[in-house]
């Protein structure tokens, strides 16, 4: 239901009561505007987190900058790959463009609450079909956006902008972590191929000596078959490691936005090593850096904006409007062939018949806001749990690496002793092959554990939300 109060110029001249009407209308509008200047309530976020981590990184070492955490690995080739991925990854570029698109629209979120002016010109005919008129007019209307309507629109634009920024940041965090993972998978797989190649040479020598032992009737029953089966298993392991390296190189090429792997990557056969480090971030830092939490915060803002808009729709909608109409009689069948009529006044749209529907929408949006708050709380708890899990994994990998380093050193010393015994004639070359194989296996286990530790490190800073500050394109709308 809408009403409009207009005051033609001729009417104002003939009626002395107009000032009282104007004063009364002004008082009514003033009171409505004062009541309508209510803010949109945004609830406090349930952002309670522990003061410190229950798990801590083992040892004290270099302080890690969360914005450049991968540089702790001190691998120049990895640094170059990360820089290339940040500049050329297709998912990240899509997220950046979507953010720019949202920012362009967010600057116009309050456009409908600004004065609008329109002009029109048309030809009309009177009801008797006698005279034809030319009408020209200018109309202006201003939706005041009372009762939180304008603020809800601005809050919604802020939520959309925050959502797009969090999605862009999430893409960047994921891309960097995936580049580190793919690079690590590639280098570990190719290092394993080298070790398996040496193991294959040992197996081949064992099969040769097994044939000699068989001719001399020195072999045990089924010895040669076991040697051949071992050599076949090594060939299968080499094929699997080569497949893993190929998969990692293709994944890395996709992350960089390349058509295919670079042949130079075949030289990546030394996995990066992680030295002792110190985690500087505390649980409260997750609230500012973890994209999933920022996404949940944007959802809360969006839900609050929708609730505020629903509440505003339950109140009268007040607009100020005015128009000037000029009419010219084209047929000149009237005594006066032209006239003008200015008018100004408020528009009041009062919800009557659909007020129940609007109230139901408000109640529904209130429930949606409660759900968004629960989602935010879950995002906070999930972030803390992921960081704690990554810290626990790092601690377990540290313990495992220490044990494997002892085993690797013991196996290496055993190879040295065995070679010495062969030189002294106290043992045979065939007996020393098993020792060499055990040493290669221990080395492979150590490389795998060191790679798993780097993966846990990458998972830690992925959970923290570690990524460089994104470069804002020049001229990007803020």
Regions found by a protein language model. Give the residues of each.
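Terminal intrinsically disordered/low-complexity segments used for targeting and assembly
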Residues: 2-7, 22-87, 242-288, 330, ...
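Periplasmic alpha-helical coiled-coil/stalk elements that build and connect Gram-negative outer-membrane
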Residues: 150, 166-282, 393, 417-420, ...
């Amino acid at each position: 239901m809408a009403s409009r109060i207009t005051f033609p110029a001729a009417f104002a001249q003939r009626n002395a009561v107009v000032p009282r009407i104007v004063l009364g209308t002004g008082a009514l509008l003033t009171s409505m505007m004062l009541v309508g200047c209510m803010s949109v309530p945004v609830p406090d976020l349930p952002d309670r987190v522990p003061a410190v981590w229950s798990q801590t990184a083992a040892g004290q070492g270099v302080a890690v900058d969360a914005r450049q955490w991968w540089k702790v690995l001190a691998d120049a080739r990895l640094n170059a790959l990360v820089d290339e991925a940040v500049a050329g990854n297709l998912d990240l570029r899509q997220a950046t463009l979507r953010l720019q698109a949202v920012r362009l629209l967010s600057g116009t979120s309050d456009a409908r609450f600004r004065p609008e002016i329109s002009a029109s010109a048309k030809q009309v005919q009177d009801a008797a079909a006698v005279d034809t008129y030319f009408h020209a007019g200018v109309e202006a209307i201003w939706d005041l956006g009372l009762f939180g309507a304008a603020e809800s629109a601005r809050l919604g634009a802020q939520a959309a902008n925050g959502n797009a920024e969090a999605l862009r940041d999430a893409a960047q965090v994921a891309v960097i972590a995936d580049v580190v993972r793919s690079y690590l998978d590639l280098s570990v797989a190719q290092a394993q191929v080298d070790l398996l190649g040496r193991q294959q040479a040992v197996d081949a020598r064992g099969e040769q000596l097994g044939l000699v032992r068989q001719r001399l009737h020195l072999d045990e029953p089924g010895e040669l078959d076991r040697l051949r089966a071992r050599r076949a298993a090594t060939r299968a392991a080499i094929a699997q490691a080569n497949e893993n390296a190929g998969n990692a190189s293709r994944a890395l090429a996709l992350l960089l936005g390349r058509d295919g792997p670079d042949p130079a990557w075949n030289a990546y056969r030394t996995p990066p090593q992680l030295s002792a480090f110190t985690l500087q971030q505390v649980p409260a830092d997750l609230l500012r850096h973890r994209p999933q939490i920022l996404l949940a915060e944007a959802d809360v803002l969006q839900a609050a904006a929708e609730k505020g808009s629903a509440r505003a729709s339950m109140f009268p909608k007040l607009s100020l409007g005015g128009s000037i109409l000029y009419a010219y009689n084209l047929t000149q069948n009237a005594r006066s062939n032209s006239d003008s009529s200015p008018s100004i006044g408020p528009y009041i749209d009062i919800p009557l018949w659909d007020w129940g529907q609007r109230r139901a929408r408000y109640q529904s949006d209130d429930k949606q806001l409660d759900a968004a708050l629960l989602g935010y709380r879950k995002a906070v708890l999930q972030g803390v749990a992921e960081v704690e899990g990554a810290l626990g994994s790092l601690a377990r990998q540290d313990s495992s690496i220490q044990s494997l380093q002892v085993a690797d050193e013991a196996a290496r010393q055993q190879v040295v002793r065995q070679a010495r015994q062969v030189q002294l004639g106290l043992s045979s070359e065939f007996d020393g092959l098993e020792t060499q194989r055990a040493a290669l296996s221990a080395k492979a286990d150590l490389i795998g554990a060191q790679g798993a530790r780097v993966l846990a490190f990458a998972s830690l800073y992925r959970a923290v939300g570690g990524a460089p500050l994104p470069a804002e394109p020049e001229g990007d709308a803020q």
